[in-house]
Amino acid sequence: MNKIYTAIIFTLISTFSLAQSSFKQNHDFGLALSYAPKEVNLSLSWKQMYGVTANQKFKLGYGLRFNGYLSNDKDYITAPAYLTSGEKGPQVLFVENIEENIDTFSVHNSQHNSINAVIYIEYDFSEKWGVGFNIDAAGIAFGGSREGTMVSSNRPANTSAQVSAKPTPYNVLLISDNDIGMLNSELYATYNFNKKLSVNAGFTFLFTEYTTEQKIAYNDNNDRFRYKSLMGMLSVNYKPFKK
């Protein structure tokens, strides 16, 4: 009986040690730069990827990401889905915007930061080449207060108002305009120089969002305004413990 207990304990210790070793080797740190005219985003990330097929080519993973975004002269529009499309839920993907419900918050200099949990999907065609997609799931956002100009579709074209706003403080991935806050996603191709070093090139699709200090009465008491960015992206990833 003692031999059985000893064997069980040894097996558990060995399994735990292997799991710890695999976790350490899978640490993947990334630095990404995304750019489009009058806007830029810098991302710092950490992730863990795990093969889910027999050949280990298809991988799922999780991680954390910091985003720092700067822009000039951007128009943030009414964010909530119930206003932009008159719908809630996944059907917002297939419904056109209701233009008369959409107001504009124009900001000369925008600055947003976020820390989010991230979901990763990747596929390796070979040891050198692969493709991937990732998306922020939930987290927090922060940044300084900004003054902007509010222009309403329900007001005369020559009428505007100055409004103060801050980045929406929390981020939640839902679906399309149901999303809340600052959320980043990337679609990319990967080239692996070796087991430790790789580069990604592709596109960043980024939501940033301001919450006004006061609700806008003529916009159905809405206080959330969103800007959607599409930028080119280049990143470097490094696995320091990979053998």
Sequence positions of predicted segments:
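Residue-level signature of outer-membrane beta-barrel architecture
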Residues: 48-52, 119-125, 177, 191, ...
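Extracellular loop and loop/strand-boundary signature of outer-membrane beta-barrel proteins
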Residues: 30-34, 47, 102-107, 170-175, ...
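Residues that define the transmembrane beta-barrel architecture of outer-membrane proteins
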Residues: 25-27, 38-44, 58, 111-115, ...
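Short glycine/proline- and aromatic-enriched beta-strand/turn motifs that initiate or cap beta-hairpins
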Residues: 20-84, 239-243
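Outer-membrane beta-barrel translocator domains and adjoining extracellular loop/strand segments
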Residues: 41-45, 72-81, 143-152, 156-159, ...
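Membrane-embedded beta-strand positions of outer-membrane beta-barrel proteins
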Residues: 29-33, 60-64, 117-119, 131-135, ...
